[in-house]
Amino acid sequence: MAKDDSTVRCFQGLLIFGNVIIGMCSIALMAECIFFVSDQNSLYPLLEATNNDDIYAAAWIGMFVGICLFCLSVLGIVGIMKSNRKILLVYFILMFIVYAFEVASCITAATQRDFFTPNLFLKQMLERYQNNSPPNNDDQWKNNGVTKTWDRLMLQDNCCGVNGPSDWQKYTSAFRTENSDADYPWPRQCCVMNSLKEPLNLDACKLGVPGYYHSQGCYELISGPMNRHAWGVAWFGFAILCWTFWVLLGTMFYWSRIDY
């Protein structure tokens, strides 16, 4: 292939442009995954307690892929500009490996969205919230994390339980074992608070008088951020894979036409 041919130069330009887009998207993917794993909503303890935090694993893979794709896009640009078969061969091999990792990340993130059901968080809350009799230290750590997270959620977001205050009444729970039904029909965090973070009217809250306790459940406030992050990691990653596929295909065609 003649390197001074105008058609070749145009094709090189297209491939370079494709790799520039890959590099830019990889930075965005990395930033998105960093934001996710930084746990801005402080919900990780709830997932950790379920023993299924694969969505975070998908985000960590996405971070790794973002770094690798950026480096490989630079390598690809250099190989195309120099029309170097060896550089491009290394580019292909590494890109296929990274591509496989990103496929795994996308599939994991997409499938985990179906995992965030009300019953999952309800079962975990009933078993672990204020559970002071764990079988081992690992469970104690998880129980403490779940308790602190639920306390913060209910206070900060003015909600109670997964589906509502009735969760604490309808089901057997560690909280019910530790507290009497008359004095603690639900956690104090379910009460409407004053400026000092004290119940506005404790007796009215315990009796379930409207306006003195929070009747809304917390499920949407938990699943919403997790689903959005899982959707972003999965589908933005999938979009990058689609673009990368065509860039790789074009680069392979270009590689096959380079003179030895």
UniProtKB/Swiss-Prot annotation:
The species this protein was found in: Bos taurus
InterPro entries, sorted: Tetraspanin/Peripherin, Tetraspanin_animals, Tetraspanin_EC2_sf
Function: Component of the asymmetric unit membrane (AUM); a highly specialized biomembrane elaborated by terminally differentiated urothelial cells. May play an important role in normal bladder epithelial physiology, possibly in regulating membrane permeability of superficial umbrella cells or in stabilizing the apical membrane through AUM/cytoskeletal interactions.
Keywords per UniProt: Glycoprotein, Membrane, Transmembrane, Transmembrane helix
Phylogenetic lineage: Eukaryota, Metazoa, Chordata, Craniata, Vertebrata
This protein's record includes keyword Glycoprotein: yes
Cytoplasmic side: 2-15, 82-86, 251-260
Tissues of expression: Bladder epithelium.
All ranges on the Extracellular side of the membrane: 37-60, 108-229
PTM info: N-glycosylated with high-mannose oligosaccharides.
Highest taxon, organism lineage: Eukaryota
Disulfide-bond pairs as recorded: none
Keyword Transit peptide: no
Gene behind this protein: UPK1B
Protein name: Uroplakin-1b
Compartments, as annotated in UniProt: Membrane
Subunit structure: Heterodimer with uroplakin-3A (UPK3A) or uroplakin-3B (UPK3B).
